[in-house]
Amino acid sequence: MSKIGKFKEQDITVIPHNKEKYMSFSIGNLRFIDSLQFLNSSLATLTKNLADEGQKHFNYLSKTFPDPDVFSLLLRKGVFPYDYVDTEQKLEKPCLPSKEDFFNKLGDTHISDEDYQFAQTVWDKLKVKTLGEYSDVYLKMDVALLADVFEKFRDISLHDYDLDPCHYFTTPGFSWSAMLKKTGIVLDLITDIDMMLFVEKGIRGGVSSIFHRYAKANNPYLFDTYEPTEPTSYLSYLDANNLYGWSMSQCLPYGHFNWLTEEEKIKLDITKLKADGSDGYIFEVDLEYPSSLHSSHSDFPLAPERKHIQVEHLSPYSKELLQNLTGKQCLTKIEKLVPNLYDKEKYIVHYRNLQLYVELGLKIKKIHRVLKFKQCPWLKKYIDFNTEKRKNAKNEFEKCLYKLMNNSIFGRTLLNTRKHKDVKLCHTEEKLNKETAKPSYASCKIFNENLVAVEKKRVNVLMKQPIYVGFCILDLSKFLMYDFHYNHMKSLYGDKIRVCFSDTDSFLYHVETEDVYEDMHQYQDMYDTSDYPPEHFLHDIENKKSNR
């Protein structure tokens, strides 16, 4: 960035994360995009994944190093003593630095014997005379390998989606266009500010909580620790396959938003609303959490809320710890997503979740507002396409790509344009004076005498993302987790099971039963057991990677 200020005759524009970090920048008609915004893995990982499919995809590397033996040698990420080279004179060193000189301060890691031997082999094979020449080889390798990886990504994208990612800045932006093209859906944008704020208020992330701090299994399959005189119990970690993929395959809103009238709210029978109906609803309600449920629901309470935890919410022991360990008598003001047993006021919730909460014992005290919309499983076609592609992928490179294409859709639906930055790069005194004189001026970052980044306050915000889709995806993911816990696990084991912790799409259970594997076998249609050893009686590929 320190050099681009010298292009005085060209306009310089950026798409910023902040004053110093940019997603992309342009000099005149030349645009620079960041490959990391598309392929968010190390070059070492990307190269290895692509190499697993063979050498045929490394066209740029073979052109850069045409000797077949050298080409075969360089089919991996190179290594370089970054911290050692702190002066130009060291580039004149006539031999490879010692293994200790390859220590990476940034990663606080030493180079492996295998990597050092690779560096020595490259030095010898290419008849390198100085560390400077080795640096040239290293850089040519990096550029050629990244070019080959990105070209493979482009080939797949053009073949599967008929779109070129080079016309985009990030994978989420590219995947969003691919989804719109593949599904043909037209999404209405909310133009009513009250509806927008209503949906925003209901957005809550995944539940990540520790509910039970210590549990010890008495597992008969673990002979060293099993106590025959004690009740048999297991620690069972279960993970939902592609949780958000499942949510994105459900009926989702696409338009025709309107508030229900008082009369329509009275006539609406929540219990009779269909999961796959053409009409969907988002409710704002007051909920009562009956005290009779508190004991059985204490390890995974329904209807989690974003809350500021107050000192009065803490137990006497926790208050004492707060004082002794921090010297403070107050807590952070950062909101947390908290599962709790309190009654809820003006709780915004998807209708399917509300149906489940009522079925499990919560009571609706009052309905404040109801937002109605049209819905259908419009995203399912795209999700299924990528899921099937991932299932049939020939290598890790393609598996990661198709997974990313699905996951990035969810993130795109929750893109918060309020957080976007407005940054101008000024490379002339005239432009700098103009930008800093504006009332919207906020701050600046001086790179050098030729370049200054000026950050401005946002004058307006365009709310152009269908965040109502993201809200529904998040709530439906909670529906699946609560439904599985209460209507399967809790129904099966009763008070013999406890949630130790939950993290968005997973549970760690402490369950008291004679044989948890036999229990799973009875409900094998609910589980993906394809990763069990082939000789295990639970091994079955029927539900491999399935999210049904």
Label for each model-derived stretch:
Residues 1-548:
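Conserved acidic
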